[in-house]
Regions:
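A short, polar/charged loop-to-alpha-helix boundary motif
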Residues: 190-204
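Radical SAM enzyme [4Fe-4S]-AdoMet core and its adjacent flexible, acidic
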Residues: 28-40, 47, 51-164, 168, ...
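Short, acidic, Ser/Thr-enriched surface-loop or helix-capping motifs
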Residues: 176
């Protein structure tokens, strides 16, 4: 709404928008709670952000469908004047749970079948290489792609700015709509819940022993 966008602008928020490329790509999997396509509504939201001068970036999931069209995917973001882009490859396993969940948690990810929408290693590699070859020609310094920027930062001995490429993780907790806080936005499962903002502070939860133990999973020599 205009009211929310005014709030974001006044308080210097950076808003992340989940959008998976042009309409035919986005609507393949991004449905609303009624099972309807969501692209039109997402673009309406982006236009509202632009109207109020709110800074925003795109968080784009790369799946089995859109990964085969890397340049169409990348050029779309340039067309809508998006200069900050995060690509997130989706790889999930399916495991049924009594509470209705169907995605496998970290401890279960070897038990279930790979979800049909998962991007393959070959697709993901080709996707990145194709976009990089286009980006490096004339877009460096104008369009910022997180995985490329973070890779360069690591190469130069700088902090990469993204936890998955950093030496240590554990600073990217996530809060759900009801105040529940989890160790990481990639692991919103019951076993990684830290607490709730209504009963504990973020500082307490993010510096808790539970969060410390989660960080150790990342620094462990185990390939997991």
């Amino acid at each position: 709404t205009d009211e929310w966008c005014e709030f974001f602008h006044e308080n210097n928020w950076l808003v992340g928008v989940s959008i998976d490329g042009p309409q035919e790509f986005h609507d393949e999997y991004r449905k609303n709670k009624m099972g309807k396509p969501s692209f039109v509504k997402v673009m309406q939201g982006i236009n509202l952000l632009k109207k109020h001068g709110v800074e925003w970036n795109a968080m784009a999931v790369v799946n089995d469908f859109n990964a085969d069209y890397p340049l169409d995917f990348y050029n779309f973001f340039k067309e809508i004047d998006c200069h900050y882009i995060q690509f997130a490859p989706i790889v999930e396993r399916i495991v049924s749970h009594q509470d209705g969940r169907h995605l496998a948690s970290l401890a279960e990810d070897k038990e279930g079948a790979l979800a049909d929408f998962s991007v393959s290693p070959e697709q993901w590699g080709n996707f990145l290489c194709t976009i990089f070859d286009e980006w490096v020609k004339e877009d460096v310094g104008n369009y910022f792609i997180q995985i490329f920027d973070s890779t360069l930062a690591n190469w130069m001995g700088e902090q990469p700015g993204v936890c998955t490429m950093a030496k240590h993780c554990g600073h990217a907790g996530v809060m759900e709509f009801n105040g529940d806080v989890y160790s990481c936005d990639h692991f919103v499962f019951p076993e990684y819940k830290l607490g709730n903002i209504y009963s504990q502070t973020l500082v307490e939860m993010m510096h808790s022993e539970r969060q410390h133990n989660f960080c150790l999973l990342y620094t462990s020599p185990s390939p997991r």
